[in-house]
């Protein structure tokens, strides 16, 4: 297990990190759109198969550390190897996760009526793929981009039947609330790429996939209640 410093979990999700605005100077404080040349520069700095690690919250893997003011803390984070890529097809730039381990979501499902689902998910060795549209947002002072992920889908056998289970991320709301849940950046210090996703919850055998009605992840870690889950992909 490797300690990841730039990773946090909160009960009520806000932005995975604070986005820096490139303002036009007017009173409306709007962000200046990137030019096509700037978007191409962003693409060149992020494309390829760079992020090969996944970090996620897990109380099965605890690291103790001491803060700068000499206070002992515990960090509930584990890491796994994954395969990701960012490529453009002439229309959209897309981030693809090729072997996502859905079993990690079992930790975020609790309740007596969810035991069969939880156990089936814990035993699931299937790795699934999912895609996210990349929208480049700023080039300077920090290269940042929004991510619009599709639902993560897996078929699970439990209770004598096959069930389709879909996992949903929170939706970004750039305007007017400026709540950014799924996004990425290039670290200015290391020039390494990282991306964050905030998961809301799941739906079993959805009746209307165009209008999902997911159940929120609700669980406790170190006796503290949490809603939702955050995962991070990063370049080692």
PLM feature segments, named:
Residues 34-46, 71-96, 102-103:
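A beta-rich soluble binding module of mature secreted/lumenal proteins
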Residues 27-34, 167-236:
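Edge beta-strand at a domain terminus
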């Amino acid at each position: 297990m490797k300690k990841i410093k730039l990773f946090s979990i909160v009960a009520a999700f806000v932005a995975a990190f604070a986005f820096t605005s490139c303002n036009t100077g007017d009173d409306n404080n709007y962000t200046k759109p990137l030019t096509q040349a700037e978007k191409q520069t962003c693409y060149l700095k992020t494309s390829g198969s760079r992020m090969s690690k996944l970090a996620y919250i897990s109380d099965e893997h605890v690291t103790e550390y001491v803060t700068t003011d000499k206070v002992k803390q515990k960090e509930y984070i584990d890491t796994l190897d994954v395969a990701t890529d960012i490529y453009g097809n002439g229309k959209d730039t897309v981030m693809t996760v090729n072997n996502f381990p859905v079993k990690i979501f079992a930790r975020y499902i609790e309740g007596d009526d969810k035991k069969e689902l939880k156990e089936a998910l814990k035993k699931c060795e299937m790795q699934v793929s999912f895609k996210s549209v990349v929208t480049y947002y700023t080039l300077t002072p920090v290269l940042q981009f929004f991510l619009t992920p599709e639902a993560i889908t897996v078929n699970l056998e439990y209770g004598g039947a096959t069930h389709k289970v879909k996992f949903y991320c929170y939706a970004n709301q750039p305007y007017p609330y400026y709540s950014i849940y799924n996004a990425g950046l290039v670290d200015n210090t290391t020039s390494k790429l990282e991306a964050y996703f905030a998961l809301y919850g799941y739906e079993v055998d959805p009746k209307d996939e165009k209008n999902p009605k997911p159940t929120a992840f609700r669980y406790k870690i170190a006796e503290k209640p949490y809603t939702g889950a955050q995962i991070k992909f990063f370049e080692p």
